Amino acid sequence: MAVRPGPMHGAPLPDTNGDIDPGPLARQATAVREMGSPFVAAVLAAGERQLYRAPRTAALIADWPRDVAADALARAGHDTALSDLYRRLDGDFDSVIGATMHAADAHIAEWMRTPPQTNEVGRTAAIMAALMTLRSRFDMPCELRELGASAGLNLNLDRYAYDLGGHVAGDPASSVRVAPAWHGAAPLIRPIAVASARGVDLSPLDVTDAAACERLMAFIWADEADRAERLAQALRIARAHPPVVDTGDITRWLPTMLAAPQAAGVCRTIVHSMALQYLDASGHAAVERAFAEAGARANADRPLARIGFEWTAARDAVHLCLTIWPDGVTRHLATCHAYGAWIDWHDTGA
């Protein structure tokens, strides 16, 4: 990728008229701005313009859709100018970001070699709504299993409080409150019971490891203090109620888990949120095959459910979908903000 220096202090990148790729950080800046985070968008745009000052980082992210580690450096507090920029959410972006990228090029490149971890607790509102819809079909506890669980914070979803368009659910005394902007029909409010919870991740984060928790916090956008506080509280709950997350590959773990004995009167429920986008075509095929084979074995006493919170194939929307076996019918319950900030509920319960 040809990296070019640009103008200073938040000036836009030149209009390419679609002829030149503006660069991975500029593309991400556009996406982040559209998702409501102008400060992080400005940081990324400045990073694109100043990328020539960090050759190791530039080489690493060429054609690679991951974010840079500026948030982690700001949180660490070692770079006073960067920390000040993040604290004030304004300033000379190009000067500060450029100097930081030049000074911390090796650190940023090394930090980016590990997979991103965004255990977004805000998505649990959509998952909880889907679980309550499922409970209206099968009045039984669920055996909750999560693919790509990260630190396993979503496995504690029954320990959080929810406000779904004025309809409350979950634990009202919880320090974690998830209240997305709700549009559409009211959700079906049902008490859910989690018989057991377990997840899998290629590199699960240990909630008792301060460095791992700090890394997770660094993925929260700097201008979203509410998200950061919610994550901090979810980590506190997780330390009191440690989630069980296996280290493993989804495509190998899922078939084994689905083949395990299932108690009668328990709905085996598989959840995945923004996890399948990291699989290649063969990985997707393996997941679909595992669900199809397990679905063929499901019955009314031992049902199987799949809750997906994923981008569409065109990556133009995030859909919340529920598939229930033995009938195998998939319902598009809602369209959602990628981090759960709003939910447009479509399901009528029919």
What are these language model-derived features?
Residues G152-N156, Y278-D280, R315-A317:
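Short catalytic/ligand-binding loop motif for oxyanion handling, primarily in non-cytosolic enzymes
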Residues F219-W221, A225-E229, P243, A285-V287, ...:
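Domain-level detector for long C-terminal conserved domains
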Residues M1-A106, E110-Q117, V121-I127:
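A short N-terminal interaction module
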Residues D79, G91-D92, G98, H102, ...:
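Class I S-adenosyl-L-methionine-dependent methyltransferase module
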